[in-house]
Amino acid sequence: MWFKNLTVYRFNKPFSVDPDSLEKSLEDFTFSPCSSQDISKFGFSKAMGKHGETLIHTAGDRHLICATKEEKILPSQVIKEALEEKVGHLEAEENRKLTKKEKDALKDEITTTLLPRAFSRRSQIRALILPEIQMILVDSSSAAKSEELMALLRKAIGTLPIIPISFKTPIETQLTEWLKEGKTPPAFEMQDEAELKSDSDEGGIVRFKQQDLSENEVLAHIEVGKQVHKLALHFGQSIAFVLQSDAAIKRLKFSEEFRADNDDLGNDDPMARLDADFALMSSELIALINAVVDALGGLEDSI
């Protein structure tokens, strides 16, 4: 349940959640496994997995949702080889070249034949809906997968007035200033990893890992015009992460000490522990996002 990445959206119109109403809306779009002829299926599943019973898990005004995706694994090379064999056989038999339309029809026929025998894989993606700060946090490093979940949520509830989070000042400008000065805002501590890019196509990219970022070797790249597009940071004593210039927060890792705060609950009641961990995680993520927004100079005015 502990989030590992954050793609952040903000509401550009006031948004509130009624848990019972949202639960009913999601029920119409619940996940069901692929049938023999389905290439993929995507739908909402239990927010707390096998330990929960509902599609939304709520604590205060924080709401967790989860979606499951099943995809058939049908390698393109397998289809290509089967198609080439079929086309070759028919062209030899009929002594003519098949048209593109005929080849496309054969490809569809081959795909339909192979689908029932294809293996499938499942993945899950979670999101935290936070009306108290008017944001949604998606646990994904992929913008495309995050958008897919938001599209499903929008379809379920009818409207979802969100935009990707953006800031008044370009993030790379702030990150570059922090690295250049060797100083971050009080809530954060710089770690030993960064990626710098040049504005020009010829300037290239340089990455540093497990290195003192205050060294002249690093700062020299800023002097020649490169800007910091990724920077590893630590938030207080709780979360390590990498902040990117596209506002994505990746490789989110909660410290063992922080995660141990609920150890006194034990594991006799898994749902009680999950509920406590959810409250702990969501509170700290809200604190992290608020601190990031403050450190970067505030959000860009919504349109």
From Swiss-Prot:
Q: Does the keyword Cytoplasm apply?
A: yes
An individual GO BP term:
regulation of DNA recombination
Which InterPro entries does the UniProt entry name for this protein?
A: RdgC (IPR007476)
Give UniProt keywords alphabetically.
Cytoplasm, DNA recombination
Q: Which residues form a coiled coil?
A: none
Q: Which GO terms describe its molecular function?
A: double-stranded DNA binding
Q: Which residues form the signal peptide?
A: none
On the tree of life, the source organism's domain of life is Bacteria
- Gene Ontology cellular-component annotations: bacterial nucleoid; cytoplasm
Q: Which parts of the chain span the membrane according to its record? A: none
Q: Does the keyword Transmembrane helix apply?
A: no
Which Pfam families does the record cross-reference, listed alphabetically?
RdgC (PF04381)
Q: Where in or outside the cell is it found?
A: Cytoplasm, Nucleoid
**Role this protein plays:** May be involved in recombination.
Tell me its family: Belongs to the RdgC family.
* Name used for this protein in its record: Recombination-associated protein RdgC
- Organism (species): Shewanella halifaxensis (strain HAW-EB4)
Organism classification: Bacteria, Pseudomonadati, Pseudomonadota, Gammaproteobacteria, Alteromonadales
Protein's gene: rdgC
